[in-house]
Amino acid sequence: MSVEKTNQSWGGRFSEPVDAFVARFTASVDFDKRLYRHDIMGSIAHATMLAKVGVLSDAERDAIVDGLQQIQAEIEAGSFDWRVDLEDVHMNIEARLTDRIGVTGKKLHTGRSRNDQVATDIRLWLRDEIDTILAEITRLQEGLLGLAEAEADTIMPGFTHLQTAQPVTFGHHLLAWFEMLGRDYERLVDCRKRVNRMPLGSAALAGTTYPIQREITCQLLGFDAVGGNSLDGVSDRDFAIEFCAAASLAMMHLSRFSEELVLWTSAQFQFIDLPDRFCTGSSIMPQKKNPDVPELVRGKSGRVFGALTGLLTLMKGQPLAYNKDNQEDKEPLFDAADTLRDSLRAFADMVPAIRPRREIMREAARRGFSTATDLADYLVRKGLPFRDCHEIVGHAVKYGVDSGKDLAEMSLDELRRFSEQIDADVFDVLTLEGSVNARDHIGGTAPNQVRAAVARGRQLLAQR
């Protein structure tokens, strides 16, 4: 029986070519071609191992390696012809290799399946992405440390429920983001450990009958360990899900930070100014200067959250081992990594350029009875129970609201209406400086604690 020849590597079983629409629908080359560098890296390592175990001759290995390197140069020069009829990045590269070096190119796939090939490619790619993202987190943290050190004495209101709560230093506030990003860094480092396990050698699902030595390819590709089960190696994408979970947490932190920057740049706050290069204007309102970078980062967080949900949904119903569903793992993973990396880059560039408006911050901290807790603590030190002190200060605050006076603006006689325990030394704790300086412990907002935290932060970054 005569059968029309197809370009697919698996066409021998079939009696007719794939429908043209189905071929386009099932092809992944339009998005997985970004894996080309890691696909070639894996193939070179695989060919090197096959030569060491005698499956390929040294001459065949050299021809394959040279051909793959030339193909990489073609791709990077923009002259490579990506073909949808060849489905994916793997078969496009293999077909071009065979075009270049002949029948030897067909030997490259010996002892390997696209199932373990793509799992290896994704892990290699994600490992590199994590390393880039970690570097951007560090760069952003360095910027936060520099700004926090410069603003260690700058007083601003701290908020709960977006209402004035207690005075803090701007430097202390910035260091909160440093801490959160530090945990994001740790999560990604930990995630990388599980990404960096090699599935290559799992073949389709059960391993291979060839005398492969997986330790060789593991070492050549820089993996920490060989995967212990071939079914697991080709079928699970928990490492990608874990990355998206860590990326979602990082984007959540950036989104919250973005919200603060948007508020602080508004006319209602005016706490900070962003350089023009990080803002845009309005097509109709000439006066507008919009904080587009933080607004967009805030919005982009949803893309990463969506990638996490999408991957969880993708995997939840699949039996072992590989299923075509897994082709859908790449686009959300790629997008999550791109979004996090670019958001971090934008923030790492922008944060050191933030210009605080110190007097406006200070005036905002002065309003809203932000030293009320300090007055309560003062009365506790005079021997009164805290709950009684809380009520006393509450009455004083009500008086202040009615009279239009902050606590520090009241006379001693006015304050003594609420407790005879109040003496002239009370004004030492009612000042903004007195309030922040009193919180002089590790993790507190006192300026010297901010400087100490900056020093610890720099030491931490130096050890990475």
Curated annotation (Swiss-Prot):
Gene3D superfamilies: Fumarase/aspartase (C-terminal domain) (1.10.40.30), Fumarase/aspartase (Central domain) (1.20.200.10), Fumarase/aspartase (N-terminal domain) (1.10.275.10). GO terms for molecular function: argininosuccinate lyase activity. Its main location: cytoplasm. It is found in: Cytoplasm. Pathway: Amino-acid biosynthesis; L-arginine biosynthesis; L-arginine from L-ornithine and carbamoyl phosphate: step 3/3. One of its GO terms (cellular component) is cytosol. The keyword Cytoplasm applies. Keywords: Amino-acid biosynthesis, Arginine biosynthesis, Cytoplasm, Lyase. PROSITE patterns: FUMARATE_LYASES. It catalyses: 2-(N(omega)-L-arginino)succinate = fumarate + L-arginine. InterPro entries: Arg_succ_lyase_C, Argininosuccinate_lyase, Fumarase/histidase_N, Fumarate_lyase_CS, Fumarate_lyase_fam, Fumarate_lyase_N, L-Aspartase-like. The keyword Lyase applies. Belongs to the lyase 1 family. Argininosuccinate lyase subfamily. This is Argininosuccinate lyase. It comes from Pseudomonas aeruginosa (strain UCBPP-PA14).
